[in-house]
Amino acid sequence: MRLDSQLLARELAAFEAQHTRRRRQLAEAFPEPGDPTAVRVGGQVLRNFCSNDYLGLSHHPELIRAATECMSRFGFGAGSAHLVSGHSHEHHALEEELAAFTGRERALLFSSGYMANLGVIGALTDRHDQVLADRANHASLLDAARLSGARLRRYAHGDMAHAEQMLLAQRAGGETGESHKSNGAGTATTLIVTDGVFSMDGDVAPVSALTALAQRHHCALMVDDAHGLGVIGASGRGTLELTGAASQAVPILVGTLGKAFGTFGAFVAGDAALIDYLIQRARTYIYTTALPPAVAAASRAGLRLAREEHWRRERLHTLTLRFRAAAAALAVPLGASTTPIQPLIVGDSAWALALSEALMNAGFWVAAIRPPTVPAGTARLRITLSAAHRDQDVDALADTLGKLWREKSAA
């Protein structure tokens, strides 16, 4: 336990010396109505290139109207957990619409993606089980596996051969998979978990290969598609649609409402038995207040717009290609991502911070991502695009990056 103030001060000083101390920037206002990409920070209006508002829906008037009208009927707070008195018509309708959108029997709302992952993995695994995870997975998947008590094994990022080696080694070690599980879920399992789109690199998981791997080794597969749903796939149904993976081959699908859909919260989609079981066993669902009904109402509006307005995804894809082409022409070495997440890996944390500050001085908000969020030596700018960005802002960002990168290379 670290409650000694001097010890805490020394650790904070160490973070400072390593250029890894985290600080918050204060967003003061959004000065252009309906435009989520212009934000005032420190008295300066910046173009935001580090949010996850991929479709530009967070300020959409239909979301604001839906939330406002709902508040006139339900008030603001839910007042209770879903299983007491907090489950409103808006929550229930949103769950049904999310289930239909993802092609599942049912969906279950959680207060955040972090809580969804903790709730699902904690409910389905225990110390008798194994969680096999991509090394680049989101921190919530890693924490969920650790807290569940299951044996956590991590394969090299995107490396299906390594993942299979781990499963074969488990079998060769004589682990039969039989147990008497305290959570009542039956025999021991291996749960394979992966991001759909990896949040720091922007690459897409090899979901089709993972489904084949899971079937060969009789494992369950869980995909957290927080950065894929609403963004990729012909109709916005995410990584599974893009990769052609069958929904029945991925029995556990996690999604978020706080990115493409422009609101807040998360959900798990699956068959009726899975959702009913999570209602009984997922502690992060049972023991917390439900999302405000107004958030659910706004989420329904965001989901409808994401489903119907295909031009938003098309616009986002066009801007992504535009930015990558401009960066390539200026010799800015972006990572190999085809999604709106465009990483520029610079390696050194101090340089990442300096580059972020230089961009802010030029009118762009791009956060520096440093260890331990990313591996040592891979500090980066995590540039994210939105359908709400203007062509001229994307071009100006690329031009500014090109200038800064040339200065770095010449130093």
Regions found by a protein language model. Give the residues of each.
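PLP-dependent enzyme catalytic core of the Aspartate aminotransferase-like
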Residues: 65, 69, 73, 100, ...
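Conserved PLP-binding catalytic core of the aspartate aminotransferase-like
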Residues: 314-321, 328-363, 373, 377-378, ...
